[in-house]
């Protein structure tokens, strides 16, 4: 099948889309867009409801969670009491391995939580971070009969009235959804993202269990970043709830596309979501392909300038956050495809960082103060981002935590040093009981990824 194309699409004037278009998006005529904006607000309002401890949690799920975690923790606790570990590092490695296996057994919600912890380099123990990086988001695919049922229920039509072809084998299967290649009746080659059955109910049930358990763990975990478990649960809920409605993801795609066009970042493109085929559990989008972001050899053999790829990536990410207040919240090698012409396609918009008004200015102040060794300015900015109450005595906090200025030369500050300076302050504050602002967590996570990408794509 040859995909119908439009080689001078009007939507490229307002969004960073490919100039070869299977369809053209009219911003005034997108069936799900207005509803998606309402859903985003609704999801944000749901977070405090899900994270406020109830008198009685979902008992059946609580029993399962406690049983699985106990099986992971008790052998470690016994070995530690009997002094069977040769070093603290061996002890941390042992418990980290057991916790990772427990997380994988508990399923989608806990796998996602493990992935957030795995992005917390400099905040969580290195053994825990490294072990949770192995947390498998690749899970067994849902049988196609269930996928077919979900698609037909969501779109309100038999499968063969929407697609002339759909691959019954998933291209990828993750904890929240799986992806299938397909071709629309009208001939366009697409990717179909389908939510796993019951995952939405499971995530919400797990969040209620976490919210009930969290207050009982305060003061019991000797890890600075886990000093305030209820705040960590709230951060996690803010991150995952929006992922459960694909109309929000489709809207995120449009917002990032608008941001990139506004900033004239023409080396990055966003796949077009279909203007009508986006529902809570199904998202149809333009198919794109290219080199994986870490396929340096493949890109160089194709004549792609990898220095340009990473340079434009850093600029687009930092400008998006600091100038426009919108940025992709989950950069990793699987979410970026470098196309044969050197442009990069961004994928998977379930998590997007948003900074508006005073919060964006506070974020900008945080970064600027980090580059100039201004600890007072950093802590004030973090307070304004919501990490601390507004009436906090900043100087008293700095004194209590012994947060002296770091020995960093602002004139030679590298990206890695900037990230470590922010991590230093945030880690100390989290040990003090502060909450990690969602946008900061996403930003630091992306900076760590991009810093590693520089080492691979432009090592010199």
Regions found by a protein language model. Give the residues of each.
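ATP-dependent phospho-/nucleotidyl transfer catalytic cores
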Residues: 126, 133-140, 152, 200-205, ...
């Amino acid at each position: 099948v040859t995909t119908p194309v439009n080689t001078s699409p009007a939507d490229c004037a307002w969004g960073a889309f490919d100039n070869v278009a299977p369809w053209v998006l009219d911003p005034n005529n997108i069936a799900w867009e207005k509803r998606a904006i309402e859903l985003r607000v609704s999801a944000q309002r749901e977070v405090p409801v899900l994270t406020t401890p109830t008198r009685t949690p979902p008992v059946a799920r609580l029993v399962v969670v406690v049983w699985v975690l106990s099986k992971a923790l008790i052998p470690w606790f016994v070995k530690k009491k009997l002094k069977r570990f040769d070093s603290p590092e061996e002890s941390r490695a042992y418990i980290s391995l057991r916790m990772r296996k427990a997380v994988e057994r508990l399923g989608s919600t806990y796998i996602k939580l493990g992935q957030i912890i795995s992005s917390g380099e400099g905040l969580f123990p290195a053994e825990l971070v490294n072990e949770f990086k192995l947390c498998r988001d690749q899970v067994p695919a849902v049988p196609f009969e269930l996928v077919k049922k979900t698609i037909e229920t969501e779109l309100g039509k038999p499968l063969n009235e929407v697609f002339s072809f759909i691959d019954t084998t998933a291209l990828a299967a993750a904890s929240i959804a799986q992806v299938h290649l397909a071709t629309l009746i009208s001939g366009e080659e697409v990717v179909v993202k389908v939510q796993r059955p019951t995952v939405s109910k499971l995530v919400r049930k797990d969040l209620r269990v976490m919210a009930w358990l969290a207050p009982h763990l305060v003061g019991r975990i000797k890890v600075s970043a886990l000093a305030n478990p209820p705040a960590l649960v709230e951060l996690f809920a803010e991150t995952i709830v929006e992922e459960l409605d694909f109309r929000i993801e489709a809207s995120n795609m449009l917002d990032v596309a608008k941001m990139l066009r506004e900033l004239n970042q023409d080396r990055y493109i966003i796949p077009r979501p279909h203007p009508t085929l986006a529902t809570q559990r199904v998202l149809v989008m333009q198919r794109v392909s290219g080199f994986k972001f870490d396929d340096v050899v493949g890109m160089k053999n194709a004549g792609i300038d990898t220095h340009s790829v990473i340079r434009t990536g850093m600029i687009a990410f930092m400008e998006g956050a600091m100038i426009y207040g919108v940025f992709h919240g989950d950069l990793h090698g699987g979410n970026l495809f470098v196309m044969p012409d050197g442009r990069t396609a961004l994928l998977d918009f379930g998590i997007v960082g948003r900074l508006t008004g005073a919060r964006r200015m506070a974020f900008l102040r945080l970064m600027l103060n980090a580059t100039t060794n201004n600890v007072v300015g950093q802590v004030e900015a973090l307070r304004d981002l919501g990490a601390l109450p507004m009436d906090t005595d900043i100087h008293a906090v700095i004194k209590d935590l012994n947060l002296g200025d770091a020995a960093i030369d602002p004139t030679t500050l590298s990206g890695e040093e900037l990230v470590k300076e922010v991590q230093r302050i945030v880690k100390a504050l989290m040990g003090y009981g502060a909450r990690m602002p969602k946008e900061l967590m996403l930003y630091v996570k992306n900076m760590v990824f991009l810093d590693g990408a520089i080492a691979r794509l432009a090592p010199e």
